[in-house]
Amino acid sequence: MMQDLRLILIIVGAIAIIALLVHGFWTSRKERSSMFRDRPLKRMKSKRDDDSYDEDVEDDEGVGEVRVHRVNHAPANAQEHEAARPSPQHQYQPPYASAQPRQPVQQPPEAQVPPQHAPHPAQPVQQPAYQPQPEQPLQQPVSPQVAPAPQPVHSAPQPAQQAFQPAEPVAAPQPEPVAEPAPVMDKPKRKEAVIIMNVAAHHGSELNGELLLNSIQQAGFIFGDMNIYHRHLSPDGSGPALFSLANMVKPGTFDPEMKDFTTPGVTIFMQVPSYGDELQNFKLMLQSAQHIADEVGGVVLDDQRRMMTPQKLREYQDIIREVKDANA
């Protein structure tokens, strides 16, 4: 008995479970079929809502085109008016229609009313898809108020910012005046000069008087005027003096007795122009200075008491030529 009851319960439970499964499967299939059936309407609604949203965006960005609606006067018989009212027709707009520029709606010219500026722009009326437009109560005819035409404001004509201007003739570039070089004034030539050279002892020493006297006499100098030595045209002291020799220490004079005499050096000088050939006299003067320097152990210096150089010798020769040309 217990086994039969258990078997019955098992069978009843299995039937109940199968019934629940069948019912659930049937319910889900029904909901899915209804969802697929309503999807085209939802798509059309969503597309229409998108178009309405685009129109709202355009209205928000700026005041759109003013639309003029013709006001129909209510007839005496309302039933005839309702009967003559055409049924609204709904046109389906494809999804890509919103991307195309909207064409302005042309109204009949005879019923145009001057635009009235409302404080708030009228919002476009959204019409649901596939639903008839509800009937609106008849409006009382409103007499159109003609707004005064705005008077044109005559502003003073302003000249164009960039008016055409005739091109001015471009003047040909004038050559810059070339400053004439100032006439070079010829440096006046020397008509006389003094050529100087020195024979000096080495630094920190002095020339011995006895050695100096012997070297001076060997070079052909003779003690004479102004208590100095002179080199004449002839070695015996005859003829005009060619160049002279003086003491480097002021007053530049000598004592013929030079045994106990010392000096840092002597100065040899020649005045140009002089007797004879000045260039030959200069060579003789240079040879005499070198001979005395060799005998007393000294050195030959220029007029600035610097070491004699070949450049300085050429400078002396140029001075002599210049003086000769000036006195030619």
From Swiss-Prot:
Induction description: Repressed 1.5-fold by hydroxyurea.
SUPFAM superfamilies: Cell-division protein ZipA, C-terminal domain
Annotated Low complexity bias: 97-115, 123-171
Disulfide bonds: none
Listed CDD domains: ZipA
GO terms under biological process: cell division; division septum assembly; FtsZ-dependent cytokinesis
Cytoplasmic side: 28-328
Pfam family, any one: ZipA_C
GO terms of molecular function: protein homodimerization activity
Region listing for Disordered, in residue ranges: 42-186
Bias type Acidic residues, positions: 51-63
Alphabetized InterPro entries for the sequence: Cell_div_ZipA, ZipA_FtsZ-bd_C, ZipA_FtsZ-bd_C_sf
Subcellular location: Cell inner membrane
GO annotation, cellular component aspect: cell division site; divisome complex; plasma membrane
Gene3D superfamilies listed in its UniProt record: ZipA, C-terminal FtsZ-binding domain
Record topology, Periplasmic segments: 1-6
Record keywords, A-Z: Cell cycle, Cell division, Cell inner membrane, Cell membrane, Membrane, Transmembrane, Transmembrane helix
Family designation: Belongs to the ZipA family.
Oligomeric and partner information: Interacts with FtsZ via their C-terminal domains. Can form homodimers prior to association with FtsZ.
HAMAP family: ZipA
Domain notes: Contains an N-terminal transmembrane domain, followed by a charged domain, an unstructured P/Q domain rich in proline and glutamine, and a C-terminal FtsZ-binding domain.
Main function: Essential cell division protein that stabilizes the FtsZ protofilaments by cross-linking them and that serves as a cytoplasmic membrane anchor for the Z ring. Also required for the recruitment to the septal ring of the downstream cell division proteins FtsK, FtsQ, FtsL and FtsN. ZipA overproduction protects FtsZ from degradation by ClpP by preventing recognition by ClpX. Does not affect the GTPase activity of FtsZ.
Protein name (record): Cell division protein ZipA
Gene (name only): zipA
